Amino acid sequence: MKRHATLAVRLSFFAVAVTHTAQADTPALSQQLEDLQSFQVIAHRGASGHAPESSMAALELAHAWGADYLELDIQMTSDGELVAFHDDTLERTSNGEGHINDHTLAELKALDAGSWFNEAHPALANPAYEGAHILTLEEVLNRFDEDVRFYLETKSPELNPGVEEGLVRRLEAYDMIETGRVLIQSFDQASLLKIHDLNPDIPLIQLVWYSPAEESEGRLTEWTGVTPGPGEITDEDFQRVADYAVGLGTNYLYDGEPVISQAFVQQAQENGLAVHVYTVNEVDEMQRLIDWGMNGLFTDYPDRLIELTE
């Protein structure tokens, strides 16, 4: 399979994407939407299987290997700065404590966000990771050339009021939207709708998480309620998402068992949505999902996925 070969599955989502990104009136934005018809390698928090997640080292590795998108979670500090950090709290991936949005940027910059990786992965330990800083969005955007695309999540917007306005303002200042260099994702539908209102040219991805329903054995539900479960979802349900988004980002497995099927993927595509699956690290699962006609995969190991798709 060629790295950017158009998928064999006949997709209709491109025309829908153009409709839902206003005029799509710049060549670069139109090219981005066209590229979403091909398979996309999405580096989950950078090459986070090889270096501390959301660190400059992880991002640089993923970019050097040729990932299509560098994926990051965006949160807001107590003094209104945008930073790249996944968890709501600091303990897992830094030597800090408490909620990230309770700290100023200066306080966060004093933390070590790299040594935990060396302790967790001694075979991959690198002294250069010690003392890695939590990155601001501006630092990330300033580091990479204009050919790099980003896949940014509004993380926990209920804990980060104003994150949408701050993010859109920053992306506009860096000409990220008109140049076709950004996708925004969220589990929070209201957050995506707010971004769509702020700038309808931004391509959006609705994240979903399917898991067994507590009250009904064998039935799957989506945890935020944005869609029914995969076994009950209709064309109309997909179309409601396509009113504001160009794609779905979904889990493939729950507790080791598949929660979506190839038919689900094809139905989403037929209703105007690209389908990206998170987070896939095993080569056999990567290959299975590629064979299903997936539009892209999130992975901690972009090198594995790139080797598979070249």
Give each language-model segment a name.
Residues 23-310:
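Phosphate-group recognition and catalysis centered on beta-loop-alpha active-site segments
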Residues 9-19:
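Bacterial N-terminal signal peptides
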Residues 1-9:
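Bacterial N-terminal signal peptides that target proteins for export
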